[in-house]
Amino acid sequence: MKLTKTFKAFFENEKSGGLLLLFVTVISLWAANSSYSAGYIAFWEKDLAGHSITHWINDGLMTIFFLLIGLELEREIYHGELSNIKNASLPIMAAFGGMLIPAATFLALNFGTSTQNGAGIPMATDIAFAIGILSLLGDKVPASLKVFLTALAVIDDLGAIIVIAVFYTTSIGFVNLAIALGIWVFLFVLNRMKVYNLIPYLIGGVIMWYFMLNSGIHATITGVILAFVIPFGDGGEKSTSYKLQHFLHQPVAFFILPLFAIANTCIAIESNWHIGLNHPNAFGIILGLVIGKPLGILLFSSIGVSAGLCALPKNLKWAHILGAGMLGGIGFTMSIFITLLAFKDPEIIVFSKIAIIIASIISGITGFVYLRYILTTNKNT
């Protein structure tokens, strides 16, 4: 399977971005637990136009990340792995299992408790981290495994977006929502009229973001729906969608996601931090990501192939799918993002973040070691 030029560029940026995320996370955790802790934590909570700096990153800059995800998803649907139903069905089935089983695992431990709202936390996959770890294995990785993991993670993020929109919206301001959707319809009309200039779409997107923010629906959803009205054309290098997607890759990989990681891993770990891990919430997150993710991905992929709904690529074995499932358990930035929507209690948020970091480390290490073993030995499984 050949990799397209666009996919290669995406993979390279995500690879480097994943390694950068790892670095800044370590630095942020160190700073939050050093002699600079008080000033460091206070900086991210500093008020800026009525909200903390962290809030502006989470509700503002992350909208740009979701815009890129939307553009990637659009390209996959029109020209990539998701354009052919036979090819798309395997990562779709895998992603479905990779969301359902972790959520069910979490709910099995938390249903009926004050933390049951966190079921969406172990459903997510951090694309940058997962691909970053996979890239460390070098040229041994089959091209189809790279494509599978990327498509799986993109679909996973789409699922996370739907979860955010449906389950983490407490109250809706219908007037603001109607205005936001009206702007989207206007931009859609511009698209159909073949208006290719990017400026009106970006201006409309900013205005739509403002009204979406005040509607009660998480403003980052704006990024995804905006992506689907930006002209795609033939998808070539001169298309509006391609130009924007290409432009956003590096700012997202090397600025927005690292900034999000720094701001949201600013965690002062107390001496009794392990006590919070005895809570069903932490157990649910860790088991959901470490066990539920690979189990769900492998199980539903197997069901899809057995039922004739999809096919396993020729150079992939079930061992590869299991390894990809392990890397899918790296929830990190996306899981933290959902945590901030699911909970209001600062203590629960901190313990949830610690659980996510632990689960992501376990998933990353086990996935890397396992895939390295099977790729090195070329074991037939």
UniProtKB/Swiss-Prot annotation:
Kindly state which reaction or reactions the protein catalyses: Na(+)(in) + 2 H(+)(out) = Na(+)(out) + 2 H(+)(in)
Q: Which family does it belong to?
A: Belongs to the NhaA Na(+)/H(+) (TC 2.A.33) antiporter family.
Organism domain of life = Bacteria
Identification of the protein by name: Na(+)/H(+) antiporter NhaA 1
Topology relative to the lipid bilayer, per the entry, is: Multi-pass membrane protein
Q: Which GO terms describe its molecular function?
A: sodium:proton antiporter activity
Q: Where found, per UniProt?
A: Cell inner membrane
Record-linked PANTHER family: NA(+)_H(+) ANTIPORTER NHAA, SODIUM ION/PROTON ANTIPORTER NHAA-RELATED
Q: Which GO terms describe its biological process?
A: regulation of pH
Q: What cystine pairs are annotated? A: none
The protein's job, in short, is: Na(+)/H(+) antiporter that extrudes sodium in exchange for external protons.
Source lineage:
Bacteria, Pseudomonadati, Bacteroidota, Flavobacteriia, Flavobacteriales
